[in-house]
Amino acid sequence: MKICDLTQFYSPVSGGVKRYLHEKIGYIDRHAHRDEHVLIVPGAKTKLKANGRSRVYTIRSPVVSRTAQYRALLNLRAVEEILDRERPDVIESADPYQLGWKALTVGRALAVPVVGFYHSHFPEAYVRKSAMLLGKTATHRVMKLSRAYVRKLYNQHAATIVASDLLGRVLRDWGVHNVRVLSLGVNPEIFRPDGSESEAIRRSLGVRSGQKLLLYVGRLAKEKNTATLLRAFKTLERCRPNEFHLLVIGDGPDRTQLRKLQLRTDNLSWIRYCTDPCELAGFYRAADLFVHPGVQETFGLAALECQACGTPVVGIRGSYMDNVICHDQESWAVENSPDALANAIEDCGDRKLSVMGRNAARVARSLYSWPRVFDELFCIYRELRSKYRRLNAER
């Protein structure tokens, strides 16, 4: 079976979607010896990189985000030519925009199933916040249109994959009829408890003895709710000075707020990028508490990875990633506000975090593994391929 993935959410410094795709390539290499993989992504120049049964096509595309280094894949003719040449058995699209529609068009021409992976809940993460500037009536109309768009696009796919039960229920309520829930995973060889380097990492960051190290990993952007995190930390600095140190790993439009806060305190460290999973795992393990302010996450891969490393998570209740939290959420914020998040961090800081972390690591490693994820996903692929072959034979 030959699988082709298409996405625009891919760059030298991108996170969850890229991790998922690379883990899939690794799974095929180690476990699916009769399968092939093709990946089509935007990049600085057009090129092909082949490695065994994996091929990565990069298509020259313009930059749309300099911090995240995302690019818009506009050369759809090149995409069509690659798909026509490769003739995949299954196409998976991780794009709700022009690339997603092109995948459907080519899939129909090749008579193969197109699977949509709903990685980004864009109507809530992007559309609603922009529409709110126009007032309540306009917001209601825009959201109604965005739900209709999601319904029209994804009902044309053979299946729509989502990473959480709650998000799956949302899409079903919107009228998407082909939803399949598939949790993501962790690599237990990399993301595991191991405190051998933690003290050295903490010293390199300037974390004082007795301080609790808070960690955030992700983009600094509105859709990630990082402004709430920074204001919450500002509150902690005022109310409980020098008790916490915050490490932020990531970049984005909200970096200006972060830099301003850095000028006011020595208890804030910033690393713009960390693309090495092993290095990232070291930061996860060195932290006492992972702070996840996002309320529109479709899964929360970073939260799962840090738990697998033995570090508990605090955040805001009610997001789509609640089901991957492997410990109780008693201390979590009950509303999306800086004060509520600051109080939640304080409450968690008074608990036995190491015990919570060890328990969470055991659960994360037992329930979430990439081989298990891809075993299930490839069953879906084979089911859809067989269905399409039967339909094509009957025509």
Q: Where do the language-model regions lie?
A:
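N-terminal subdomain of nucleotide-sugar transferases
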Residues: 1-52, 57-58, 392-395
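Conserved acidic donor-binding segment of nucleotide-sugar-dependent glycosyltransferases
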Residues: 327-339, 346-351
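Nucleotide-activated donor-binding/catalytic signature segment of Leloir-type glycosyltransferases, i.e.
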Residues: 256-278
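Carbohydrate-associated surface elements
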Residues: 166, 185
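Short hydrophobic beta-strand element within catalytic cores of glycosyltransferases
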Residues: 312-315
